[in-house]
Amino acid sequence: MKNILKIWTAALIFIFAASCSKNSDTGISLSLKGTTTFPAFKKGATIEGFTFSEALLGIKEIEIKKEDEMMDDGDMDFDYDGSYIVDLLLGKSTPALGFSEFLPGTYNKFESKTASVLDGGKSLSVKGIYTDAAGTAYSFDVSTTSKIKFEFESDTAFVLTEGTVLDMLINLNLPMLFEGVDFSKATANGSGIIVINDLTNSAILTKIMSNIDQIANMEDEHESEHD
């Protein structure tokens, strides 16, 4: 039987499922995935009309830190180092994030840094179609080469015990990247696609990056009981 704990913000949902390992392994198996739905307590704040065809994130470092870490002490950090291309639509990464050994303890802080490892030196690439309430469809292609740091700290920590492997799934709400974006004010290219990057429709990218900044620095708003 698995013990399941959910910790979420409006944009990020952390789901932990702990089960006893059949061997002596102690650690975390990590995956990231995009989502287009909100937690139940945010149902009144939906952002509808999005269909995504691509959502890629370049990652170079992920750190999960102990609750009692008072200083930036490398001995207290347990991380995934390397270059990862995360497909948020499929919930898979190349290479796979998979399992990493951690010391038993109480953890409550997550940090991640993006890297420009996607094609064209991008750190984020999101493509799709947005259809507004009037039925007008806008094809978009959003990308940036900027480095993004995600930080999340929760009052509700999770405990990793000896001989336990913790399955950790992080869901990122993709429509929230576009909150407050008016596609009707964007300029489309010759193919009718709204390209949004550091050089084209840059004012819209500034708004999207502002949304990302808010997403990237959040504390939990709600936590569920163990199921």
Predicted regions: what is each one?
Residues 1-9:
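Bacterial N-terminal signal peptides that target proteins for export
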Residues 11-14:
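Short, linear, compositionally biased motifs with a strong N-terminal bias
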